[in-house]
Amino acid sequence: MATSAPVTSRTETLAKYLKLDQKGQIMAEYVWVDAAGETRSKSRTLPEKDYKAEDLPVWNFDGSSTNQAPGDNSDVYLRPCAVYPDPFRGSPNIIVLAECWNAGGTPNKFNFRHDCVKVMDTYAEDEPWFGLEQEYTLLGPDNRPYGWPTGGFPAPQGEYYCGVGTGKVVQRDIVEAHYKACLYAGIQISGTNAEVMPAQWEYQVGPCLGIEMGDQLWVSRFFLARITEEFGAKVSLHPKPIAGDWNGAGLHSNFSTKAMREEGGMKVIEEALKKLEPHHAECIAEYGEDNELRLTGRHETGSIDSFSWGVANRGTSIRAPRETAAKGYGYFEDRRPASNADPYRVTKALLQFSLA
């Protein structure tokens, strides 16, 4: 059977070209979300200036090649919605996050940002804050978790979470590169750590206000995909990449409103959870693919079939941190979203169903 050798970028050779004068031009990398819930991108040259999203030109791409449009009407338009410094090419080059729109002026079927903005605007006075914990698994050329023995398994879980040292963690260089790239670009990345399963990591983004949460998480995912590309690794957002007695991967979603963060906020949180409970099935439908493999009631998850909450309990649908309960105000954590969930869909559902 044919096999392919891992391919890594020659970044040391590329470095000398990145220093060349651009003659008053910049490179703008337009990034969008495709039909499979993954990022795509392409570049264009623009005159050098300080750009805001509204200053940037609308562009287009072949939607028939991304399963976002039919071949006989394939143009999908890219409408810029957020701009970030480019950590790969450096200043003055930019990353442009764009929404996908159809030729007829309607949002593309896979443009979940559009409806999310509407909900965020509806509840803007509540000042919704979000913080998302993105778990992911690094894979090698054989599509097995990086560093796992060929044809076998590592030692059982227990020594890997926040681990330090050879045999406990792998590919920390990818994690560090991603952390610095996010900071450079202005992503509100708040931390990172090794997770319970070997080759699994997590980073946190937030707190972010409203729509900025989804925007920043999608750009951070794009950065992660680009960085693993350079290191010859793959990143998986599958919520249960390895069957058996191994933790899955989630997108734990921390949420609060202004009223929850003030004195007496715990009562507001409890009322919000009462409103969330009857919408459990609707939330699960928005919270990612293959989540039934992860939400089993084991491995620090609640059951996919029922809604539950508790203080400092990681085996429930919703966890109220011990500190929040002790102070009487703060935030809560929705532990149901899968690692591959769309942050626009998650934050929209969480805000809409907890306040409606």
Swiss-Prot record:
InterPro entries: Gln_synt_N, Gln_synt_N_sf, Gln_synth/guanido_kin_cat_dom, Gln_synth_cat_dom, Gln_synth_gly_rich_site, Gln_synth_N_conserv_site, Glutamine_Synthetase. Keywords: ATP-binding, Cytoplasm, Ligase, Nucleotide-binding. It catalyses: L-glutamate + NH4(+) + ATP = L-glutamine + ADP + phosphate + H(+). SUPFAM superfamilies: Glutamine synthetase, N-terminal domain (SSF54368), Glutamine synthetase/guanido kinase (SSF55931). Its main location: cytoplasm. It is found in: Cytoplasm. Residues 112-356 form the GS catalytic domain. GO terms for biological process: glutamine biosynthetic process. Its EC number is 6.3.1.2. Residues 26-105 form the GS beta-grasp domain. Homooctamer. Belongs to the glutamine synthetase family. This is Glutamine synthetase. It comes from Fusarium solani subsp. phaseoli. The gene is GLN1.
